[in-house]
C-alpha cells in the first residue's frame, strides 16, 4: 500500500544532487527533506526532526530557522516535558500559498480554493455558459477572481488544476476533444490560464481527476492499483497503476465508452459515443426507461431507480440489464488490469448498491480474481478534489524550486489576496514584483 501522505510529497529533485555537488545545493535539498517531514508529522521538535531526517542537530536547527524566516515553517508552542527543558515545536505553514481546483463540466463549472495542506477554504459553483472555448476560458478566469473576492488576508495563488471532459494532452495542457462541449478541439487551456494568472497549471481528463480525488481522500485512499469508473452523461475510466495515473501513448487510456461487448456488431459505427455509452450512458438509460415505462415514467433516471426499489417490474428489469452490461465491461477491465479495487462513481454510479450488487454478480461469475467493487466515497466532489490535488502537487514543486533556486519567499506575501484593481488578475508567484514579500534570508 502506498503511504497515505504520498500524494502530497514535496518533489525531491535527486538529479540536482548530481548536477550540483556544492554545499549550497545540498543544504537546499536538506531543507526540502525537513519541510516534507514537518508536513507529514505535524508539530515536531528540532531534535525529532534530526532523528527523522538523519541530519545533524546543528544543521537542522539552522535550516529550520531559515525556513521560519522564509515563512514556510512557524513555531507553535512547546512539547510535553519529559523532565528536561521543553522543546519548541514547529509546523508547516499551510497558508504560505493557496491553490484553485476546477471541475469543468458540460453543465456546471465548480471551483475550490485550498491552502497548501489541502484544506478547502472556499467553493463556488456556476452553470457553464456559452460552450465556445474562448467564452468558457473567460468564464473560468472570472470565476477564479470571484472566488478570491471577499477572501481578505488569503495568501497568493500558487497553482491551478483543471479537470476537463474529453481527451487531454497532459504534457501540453491541451484539451484534444470534448464531445460534451461544442467546439472544443485542441484547446490550449493551460497556456491561457498560465498567461492570465502567472502560475503553473495542470490540465487532465475529468475522470482521471476523479481517480486522483478518490486516491487522496476517498475509498481508494492509499491504494496504488485501482480503476475509477464514471457513469453519467458519458462513460469513462481513470486507471491508477502503482500509484500513477495511466494515460496511454496517445492519452486514450480509460476511454472505455468504446469497449465493444458484442463481436457481431464490430462494423457498426457508434460515433463519438462508442458502444458502452450508447447502451448505458445517461441518455441511453433515459430513452430505454421511457420506452419500457410508457405512461408510468418520464425518462428521469432517478425515477427509474426509485421505481425499481418500489418493485416496478419494468424498472427492475432495466436496472438489471444496465448492471449486466456494466458488469461485463468491468469484468473485461479487471481481467486486463487486475486492480485491487474498482470504484464506481459519476451521476449514475452514485446510486450505490442497487446497481453495484447485480454488477458484482456478473464480475464474480466471469473473473476468477475478485477485486473490491465500491461506490464512490466522494460523490460528485471526486473530480473537484482531484483537481485540487493536481494543483497541490504543482505547488509543492514551486516551493521546492524556490528553495533549490535560492529564490525569495516564493509565493508568500503580506498583502491580502484580492484581484488586482488595475488588471483584474489574482496575484501569484509570477507576480511577486507587485507585492511586498516577507523578509527572506538565503539558506545557510
Name each model-derived stretch.
Residues 102, 116, 156-275, 389-416, ...:
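Phosphate-binding/catalytic loop of phosphoryl-transfer enzymes
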Residues 1-78, 82-156, 196-197, 263-267, ...:
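ATP-binding/phosphotransfer module of carbohydrate and carboxylate kinases, centering on a glycine-rich
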Amino acid at each position: 500500500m502506498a503511504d497515505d501522505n504520498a500524494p502530497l510529497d514535496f518533489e525531491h529533485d535527486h538529479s540536482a544532487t548530481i548536477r550540483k555537488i556544492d554545499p549550497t545545493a545540498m543544504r537546499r535539498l536538506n531543507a526540502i527533506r525537513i519541510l516534507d517531514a514537518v508536513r507529514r508529522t505535524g508539530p515536531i521538535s528540532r531534535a525529532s526532526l534530526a532523528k527523522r531526517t538523519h541530519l545533524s542537530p546543528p544543521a537542522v536547527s539552522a535550516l529550520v530557522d531559515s525556513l521560519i524566516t522564509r515563512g514556510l515553517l512557524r513555531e507553535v508552542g512547546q512539547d510535553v516535558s519529559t523532565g528536561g527543558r521543553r522543546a519548541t515545536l514547529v509546523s508547516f505553514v499551510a497558508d504560505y500559498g493557496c491553490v484553485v481546483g476546477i471541475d469543468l463540466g458540460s453543465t456546471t463549472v465548480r471551483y475550490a480554493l485550498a491552502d497548501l495542506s489541502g484544506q478547502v477554504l472556499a467553493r463556488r459553483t456556476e452553470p457553464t455558459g456559452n460552450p465556445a472555448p474562448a467564452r468558457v476560458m473567460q468564464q473560468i478566469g472570472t470565476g477564479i477572481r470571484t472566488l478570491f473576492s471577499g477572501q481578505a488576508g488569503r495568501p497568493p495563488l500558487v497553482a491551478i488544476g483543471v479537470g476537463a471532459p474529453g481527451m487531454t494532452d497532459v504534457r501540453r495542457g491541451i484539451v484534444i476533444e470534448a464531445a460534451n462541449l461544442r467546439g472544443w478541439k485542441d484547446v490550449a487551456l493551460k497556456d491561457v490560464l498560465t498567461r492570465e494568472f502567472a502560475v503553473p497549471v495542470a490540465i487532465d481528463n475529468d475522470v482521471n481527476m476523479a481517480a486522483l480525488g478518490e486516491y487522496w481522500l476517498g475509498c481508494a485512499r492509499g491504494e496504488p492499483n485501482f480503476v475509477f469508473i464514471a457513469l453519467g452523461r458519458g462513460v469513462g475510466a481513470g486507471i491508477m497503476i502503482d500509484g500513477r495515473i495511466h494515460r496511454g501513448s496517445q492519452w486514450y487510456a480509460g476511454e472505455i465508452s468504446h469497449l465493444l461487448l458484442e463481436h457481431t456488431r464490430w462494423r457498426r459505427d457508434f460515433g463519438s459515443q462508442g458502444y458502452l455509452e450508447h447502451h448505458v450512458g445517461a441518455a441511453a438509460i433515459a430513452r430505454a426507461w421511457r420506452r419500457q415505462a410508457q405512461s408510468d415514467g418520464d425518462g428521469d433516471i432517478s425515477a427509474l431507480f426509485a421505481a425499481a426499489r418500489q418493485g416496478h417490474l419494468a424498472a427492475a428489469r432495466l436496472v438489471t440489464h444496465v448492471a449486466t452490461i456494466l458488469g461485463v465491461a468491468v469484468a473485461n477491465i479487471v481481467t486486463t488490469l487486475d486492480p485491487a479495487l474498482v470504484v464506481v462513481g459519476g451521476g449514475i454510479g452514485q446510486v450505490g448498491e442497487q446497481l453495484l450488487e447485480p454488477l458484482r454478480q456478473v464480475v464474480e461469475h466471469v473473473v476468477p480474481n475478485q477485486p473490491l467493487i465500491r461506490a464512490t466515497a466522494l460523490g460528485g466532489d471526486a473530480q473537484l478534489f482531484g483537481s485540487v490535488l493536481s494543483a497541490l502537487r504543482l505547488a509543492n514543486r514551486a516551493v521546492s524550486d524556490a528553495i533549490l533556486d535560492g529564490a525569495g519567499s516564493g509565493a508568500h506575501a503580506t498583502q491580502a489576496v484580492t484581484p488586482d484593481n488595475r488588471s483584474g488578475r489574482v496575484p501569484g508567484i509570477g507576480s511577486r514584483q507587485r507585492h511586498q514579500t516577507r523578509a527572506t534570508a538565503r539558506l545557510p
